[in-house]
């Protein structure tokens, strides 16, 4: 492969779409805490002065949607009308119904192992050995930039920062290996009283330099910090936000394919979410086992049917054992039926709100990031 550039982006927890994702997953977590078998499909819309929470929820739990919403917005940092959005005064509207019984009859079964998929669909999982967390570097460092923005905003290092921010990182590759960072974009909402020069200097020193590895930066690396020159109006005042609109930020930054289904607000019976997590788990264990340098898994389902309709393993020519053997190993060591993967990854717990900002993958404490099958795979493949 010749020299090429690859770019990925991320957005902060204060981005309007991410506010929506976090509210949806906060509602999901609150319900799962009381009722692990609940069926939840929670969608959120945010705009200046208002939040609308809707969807289909079937549960024995009772949760205070308004309180959950306000607490989530407050934790993000929208606590004053000067920011264009205020957790204490925004309107919170609710429009929630129940899951269709037509769907439910295909999911719930007398034998849990025969639990059907909550919908048809295709999901992808991916892993690569180019970073320590077995994720693509561009999206990994894009996430870390906006995580650092939130950190220095909340700890008072840069008190004039506001919650809304975006990052973008362009990496240089030569024959598939990283050789440097070509460009960095960071746009952050800020208070009215900070001048552009001071902002750019502070962002460079407190956010960019502590986050990006120095060996990948050079004299030709380009930096674009608030390139429009002003970013005072942000958050839901600047743009409306919707659950599920940042699916590439949530996954692999465009370096792997995507089945199209969003994650946030969905309980684990929805394979859009749970099977995408399982596919990441499979791909990561294959790479961690040294069976391939890069691995992409596709899995697909039919609504109401337990067994996947297909499983595909793609290793882009980096496999250390035959591709056919990899597919057999996946089928042997990973139960990708809905009930099986829920049990395998222990998904019926309130763990989802934290996933809703800074990426669902590449953070080691999530159960789908375990590499506990790597040694088994390596042994079964006959590698020493």
UniProtKB/Swiss-Prot annotation:
Pathway: Amino-acid biosynthesis; S-adenosyl-L-methionine biosynthesis; S-adenosyl-L-methionine from L-methionine: step 1/1. Mg(2+) binds at residue 17. Keywords: ATP-binding, Cytoplasm, Magnesium, Metal-binding, Nucleotide-binding, One-carbon metabolism, Potassium, Transferase. One of its GO terms (cellular component) is cytoplasm. Its cofactor is Mg(2+); K(+). Residues 99-109 are annotated as: Flexible loop. ATP binds at residues 15, 164-166, 230-231, 239, 245-246, 262, 266. L-methionine binds at residues 56, 99, 239, 270. K(+) binds at residue 43. GO terms for biological process: one-carbon metabolic process; S-adenosylmethionine biosynthetic process. GO terms for molecular function: ATP binding; magnesium ion binding; methionine adenosyltransferase activity. Binds 2 divalent ions per subunit. Binds 1 potassium ion per subunit. The keyword Nucleotide-binding applies. Transmembrane segments: none annotated. Its main location: cytoplasm. Catalyzes the formation of S-adenosylmethionine (AdoMet) from methionine and ATP. The overall synthetic reaction is composed of two sequential steps, AdoMet formation and the subsequent tripolyphosphate hydrolysis which occurs prior to release of AdoMet from the enzyme. Homotetramer; dimer of dimers. This is S-adenosylmethionine synthase. It comes from Klebsiella pneumoniae (strain 342). The lineage of its organism: Bacteria, Pseudomonadati, Pseudomonadota, Gammaproteobacteria, Enterobacterales. The gene is metK.
């Amino acid at each position: 492969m010749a020299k090429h550039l690859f770019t990925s982006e991320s957005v902060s927890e204060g981005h309007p779409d991410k506010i929506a994702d976090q509210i949806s997953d906060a509602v999901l977590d609150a319900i799962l805490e009381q009722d692990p078998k609940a069926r939840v499909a929670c969608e959120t819309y945010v705009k200046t002065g208002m939040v609308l929470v809707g969807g289909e929820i079937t549960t024995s739990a009772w949760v205070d949607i308004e309180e959950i919403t306000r607490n989530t917005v407050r934790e993000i940092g929208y606590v004053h009308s000067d920011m264009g959005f205020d957790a204490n005064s925004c309107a919170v509207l609710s429009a929630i119904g129940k899951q269709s019984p037509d769907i439910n009859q295909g999911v719930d079964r007398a034998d849990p192992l025969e639990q059907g998929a909550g919908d048809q669909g295709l999901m992808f999982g991916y892993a690569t050995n180019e970073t320590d967390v077995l994720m693509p570097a561009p999206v990994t460092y894009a996430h870390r930039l906006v995580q650092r923005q939130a950190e220095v905003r909340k700890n008072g290092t840069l008190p004039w920062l506001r919650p809304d921010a975006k990052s973008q990182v362009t990496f240089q590759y030569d024959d598939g290996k990283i050789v440097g960072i070509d460009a960095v974009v960071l746009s952050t909402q800020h208070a009215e009283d900070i001048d552009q020069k001071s902002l750019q200097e502070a962002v460079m020193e407190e956010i960019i330099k502590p986050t990006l590895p120095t060996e990948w930066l050079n004299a030709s690396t380009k930096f674009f910090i608030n390139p429009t020159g002003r970013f005072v109006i942000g958050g839901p005042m600047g743009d409306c936000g919707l659950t599920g609109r940042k699916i590439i930020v949530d996954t692999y930054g465009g370096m792997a394919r995507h089945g199209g289904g969003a994650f946030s607000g969905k309980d684990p019976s929805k394979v859009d979410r749970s099977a995408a997590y399982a596919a990441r788990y499979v791909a990561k264990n294959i790479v961690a086992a040294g069976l391939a340098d890069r691995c992409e898994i596709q899995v697909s389902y039919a609504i109401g049917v337990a067994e996947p309709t297909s499983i595909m393993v793609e290793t882009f020519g980096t496999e250390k054992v035959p591709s056919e053997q990899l597919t057999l190993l996946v089928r042997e060591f990973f139960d990708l039926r809905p009930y099986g993967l829920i049990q395998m990854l222990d998904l019926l717990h309130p763990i989802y709100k934290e996933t809703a900002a800074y990426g669902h993958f590449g953070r080691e404490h999530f159960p789908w990031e375990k590499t506990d099958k790597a040694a088994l795979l390596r042994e079964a493949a006959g590698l020493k």
